[in-house]
Curated annotation (Swiss-Prot):
Species this chain originates from: Pasteurella multocida (strain Pm70)
Principal location: membrane
Subcellular localization, as worded in the UniProt entry: Cell inner membrane
Keywords (A to Z) from UniProt: Cell inner membrane, Cell membrane, Membrane, Transmembrane, Transmembrane helix
NCBIfam families named in the record: hyp_HI0043 (TIGR01620)
A Pfam family: DUF697
Transmembrane segments: 62-82, 90-110, 213-233
Membrane topology: Multi-pass membrane protein
GO cellular component: plasma membrane
Family to which this protein belongs: Belongs to the UPF0283 family.
Protein name: UPF0283 membrane protein PM0909
Length: 358
């Protein structure tokens, strides 16, 4: 049996009782939606590892071997030209002259391709350097450190303006220089440069992306042949990337164009469907496309959005300064334009068919 316990009045008064405070509930409660958590850091690190692999010794050796081979071919061509001239072998001299010219043209074209590829790599490294400066200045807020980062980002923005081939009398550049202040942080300097200098380029490219997406959507929705759609979209997408690079002052060659397309397509593959869901939202569920538009129109909308995503990714890589928070273009406005354009196109075609039948 349990033993008897005696309680005194002093013990009960000294014991502290832990009561739960009352909670009041109202009829209306605000529930915040949980944002989807995406492993952006892991995706970004993996993507950068693929796009910019570590330099290997065999690549350096292969480049040196190719360089020595080019010099050997040039030297042999010149030697052949001199020998045929000295020996009065005019037929061989003509052949050697043509060969020498072809070799020189080939080497010069390879040199131009290499320079364009170097400029593209320099543009990407400049963008990454600006990202690093902005990231470091956001973490460390010391006065001396902020002043140092202010000068660094200012020098980078000036170099970006030179890459864009802007003159010293450009209105946007002059406005940016006049609005600068020593008290501004690196983020404020970069944001000011983006809004004054890069804003006209961004607006032009956004219009180009919207136009290309609308054209691709209408062509796919109207065209009956899938083969024609495939070749048309391939040509249009490559042309879109070239136009975006040209607007941002990047001169693309063969290898630099391949490298840029590789980076854009890899980024599209790594981003996946989660980014599309974030950009578009759940508007698709409320619009009931299957009840209003045909399957072909839905295919056109999908192709148009993919074209827009391709243009936005190319814009991210070609833009000298990386997008900050809230500056990156989204697919919402392009989605609305696609829906309106396709709806008007299909409804117009249906009305004409009804009139013809009547």
């Amino acid at each position: 049996m349990n033993e008897k316990r005696l309680f005194t009045e002093a013990q009960t008064e000294n014991e502290a009782v832990d009561f739960t405070p009352k909670r009041e509930f109202h009829g209306e409660m605000h529930i915040e939606k949980d944002e989807p958590v995406i492993e952006d850091r892991f995706v970004e690190q993996t993507f950068e590892h693929i796009v910019q692999p570590r330099s290997r010794w065999w690549k350096t050796g292969l480049a040196l071997t190719a360089l020595l081979f080019c010099f050997a071919v040039i030297a042999q061509s010149i030697q052949w030209l001199v020998d045929t001239w000295q020996q009065n072998q005019w037929i061989y001299f003509v052949f050697s002259l043509v060969t020498c010219l072809v070799v020189l043209l080939g080497v010069s074209s390879l040199g131009k391709e290499w320079l364009r590829l170097v400029k593209l790599k320099k543009r990407l490294s400049l963008q990454q350097k600006s990202q690093q400066i902005l990231r470091e200045s956001a973490v460390n807020l010391g006065q001396d450190f902020c002043a140092e980062k202010h000068q660094q980002i200012k020098a980078l923005c000036t170099e970006m303006a030179q890459m864009l081939k802007l003159s010293s009398e450009d209105p946007g550049l002059i406005q940016w220089q006049n609005q600068l202040h020593d008290a501004y942080s690196a983020q404020e300097v970069a944001h000011l440069f983006s809004q004054t200098v890069l804003h006209p380029f961004d607006v032009q490219i956004k219009k180009l992306i919207s136009k290309s997406a609308l054209e691709a959507a209408v062509i796919v929705a109207v065209s009956p042949l899938a083969v024609i759609d495939m070749f048309f979209l391939s040509w249009r997408n490559i042309r879109l990337v070239n136009q975006i690079a040209q607007i941002y002052g990047i001169e693309l060659g063969y290898w630099s164009r391949l490298r840029l397309l590789k980076m854009v397509l890899l980024n599209l593959a790594f981003a996946g469907a989660t980014e599309v869901v974030q950009d578009i939202g759940l508007d698709w569920l409320s619009q009931d496309l299957t009840a209003k538009l045909s399957a072909r129109a839905a295919q056109g909308i999908g192709v148009g959005l993919l074209t827009a995503r391709l243009g936005i990714k190319a814009m991210e890589f070609c833009r000298p300064l990386a997008f900050q928070a809230g500056e990156k273009p989204r697919l919402n406005h392009i989605q609305q334009e696609l829906l309106g354009q396709l709806r008007s196109t299909f409804f117009r075609s249906n009305k004409t068919k009804v009139k013809q039948q009547v």
